[in-house]
């Protein structure tokens, strides 16, 4: 298995519901190392830039509005097969379809307020990490 990095967001609803610690505990108990993290309140421009691939889709404006509604946590996770394993831990995008014990089953409030975001491929992880973190803000640990 390959050591990978993935990008993760704890969305405004999960931050507002004080779920940061519980979600971080799940990451660490799954074997991930959190090698970068910070709290942000996205501007409209930042959210539109991050989700640019969805511009023009019917859910875009609502997604931007939600993602700018309160603070978020952004983090870089490192571990074996990190991208796919993180997606497995998150659960289905629609929390109604998420398996019990996944982050979205446990912490989502709705389809949009689904608690977490995670990169869908190694290439998107690299792009998303670079969007929020400079190289000197990432601290690999052995």
From Swiss-Prot:
Its main location: cytoplasm. The keyword Metal-binding applies. The active site is at residue 117. Keywords: ATP-binding, Cytoplasm, Kinase, Magnesium, Metal-binding, Nucleotide metabolism, Nucleotide-binding, Phosphoprotein, Transferase. It catalyses: a 2'-deoxyribonucleoside 5'-diphosphate + ATP = a 2'-deoxyribonucleoside 5'-triphosphate + ADP; a ribonucleoside 5'-diphosphate + ATP = a ribonucleoside 5'-triphosphate + ADP. It is found in: Cytoplasm. GO terms for cellular component: cytoplasm. Disulfide bonds: none annotated. Belongs to the NDK family. Major role in the synthesis of nucleoside triphosphates other than ATP. The ATP gamma phosphate is transferred to the NDP beta phosphate via a ping-pong mechanism, using a phosphorylated active-site intermediate. PANTHER family: NUCLEOSIDE DIPHOSPHATE KINASE (PTHR46161), NUCLEOSIDE DIPHOSPHATE KINASE DDB_G0292928-RELATED (PTHR46161:SF3). Homotetramer. This is Nucleoside diphosphate kinase. It comes from Yersinia pseudotuberculosis serotype IB (strain PB1/+).
């Amino acid at each position: 298995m390959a050591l990978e990095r993935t990008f993760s967001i704890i969305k405004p609803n999960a931050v507002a519901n004080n779920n940061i610690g519980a979600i971080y505990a799940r990451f660490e108990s799954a074997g991930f190392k959190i090698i970068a993290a910070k709290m942000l309140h996205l501007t409209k421009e930042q959210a539109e830039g991050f989700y640019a691939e969805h511009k023009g889709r019917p859910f875009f404006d609502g997604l931007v509005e939600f993602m700018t509604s309160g603070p978020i946590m952004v983090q870089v996770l490192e571990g074996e097969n990190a991208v796919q394993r993180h997606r497995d831990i998150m659960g289905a995008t629609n929390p109604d379809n998420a398996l019990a014990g996944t982050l979205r089953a446990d912490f989502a409030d709705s389809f949009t307020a689904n608690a977490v975001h995670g990169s869908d491929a190694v290439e998107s992880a690299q792009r998303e990490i670079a969007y929020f973190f400079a190289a000197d803000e990432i601290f690999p640990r052995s």
